UniProtKB/Swiss-Prot annotation:
Keywords of this entry: Endoplasmic reticulum, Hydrolase, Manganese, Metal-binding, Signal
Cited function: Hydrolyzes certain amino acid conjugates of the plant growth regulator indole-3-acetic acid (IAA), including IAA-Ala, IAA-Asn and IAA-Tyr.
List of residues binding Mn(2+) 1: 136, 172, 396
One example GO MF annotation: metal ion binding
Similarity section: Belongs to the peptidase M20 family.
Protein name: IAA-amino acid hydrolase ILR1-like 1
Encoding gene, per UniProt annotation: ILL1
Amino acid sequence: MALNNFLTFQLLLLLLRVSSESPWIVAGDVSRIPINFLELAKSPEVFDSMVRIRRKIHENPELGYEEFETSKFIRSELDLIGVKYRFPVAITGIIGYIGTGEPPFVALRADMDALPIQEAVEWEHKSKNPGKMHACGHDGHVAMLLGAAKILQQHRQHLQGTVVLIFQPAEEGLSGAKMMREEGALKNVEAIFGIHLSPRTPFGKAASLAGSFMAGAGAFEAVITGKGGHAAIPQHTIDPVVAASSIVLSLQHLVSRETDPSDSKVVTVTKVNGGNAFNVIPDSITIGGTLRAFTGFTQLQERIKEIITKQAAVHRCNASVNLAPNGNQPMPPTVNNMDLYKKFKKVVRDLLGQEAFVEAVPEMGSEDFSYFAETIPGHFSLLGMQDETQGYASSHSPHYRINEDVLPYGAAIHATMAVQYLKDKASKGSVSGFHDEL
């Protein structure tokens, strides 16, 4: 009997030891959840899965609102881990749900569209779709969110509310976030978090700031119409080329002479099209470009239109101006909520170390995450993957690559932010409604 008791005791000790060494959290160990998520994300089970997902999506890039195969693949991964979801939302978008199905609700977002770029990186998983490439890290964003979903689903019994997973189409200029918002993606959601990989931020560090982070963005296109004719007798023409040249130069004054130096704005002409012969003055010239601003966006648009039309008139030409060419609606600035910024900063330091958080500076780049963040409290951040020995190219470059070693950091931050937000919110009490889908 004594021998049996001794063996039973030794067996219990062995089980306890194995349990303590396992990264997967057992019931009753809720306090360890945020601390353990980075360890879990780095485990072969999660890390290998994220790498596989990222490479699969990278090989098959699809443009905005055309992410049919990408969406199908994401849904299959959600099915594998038993996560319920709603589809379609905004044509190809997906909304997944993990947790109680009850308040509070917090959302995590990943974009999934590619860019019309021919990949120049030669490697085993190079894009198989000519002229299309994941050159902005969206394949990594999806992989990180699915990694977080895997971790959260394994610990769903500990969630004090519901995590909403938003897989968004068409971030690159087509305002997919706006369409998802219009189709109810934020129903009952009280806060939303987004992460973007950054080749300019040191590896493993997260950058953010409170307030305006990403500029509002818009586009413009103008057709300047004159009267074409032979280039040898310009006096018999009304030259739209000269008018367009004057317009391009005059637009530069909007920033250098009309903008407070402490208030960043950008107006850039990116295309000038017209004419097809050396000895013919064309009837018209088309110009177009982009504008970025944190404040005074509407006024900047009005001045662009005014300068184009009046400079054209000075040169006896007419001008028509389109401030939403190709359906590209102006995008508001991305503004980080102060309370969420404080939570994010604390989570990053607790999870990755005190030096892991970097105070960012405002970016003139734009993000349609802004449509979510102007509706409910939101927080957008950059996750660094910079490695000077590797020389990672900037976003939107045909040479763009991802440092896959950073994927666990993104998954862990996603999961920890969701758990911590729900924990804090539940402790204060939440009055939101229920999701009909759950």
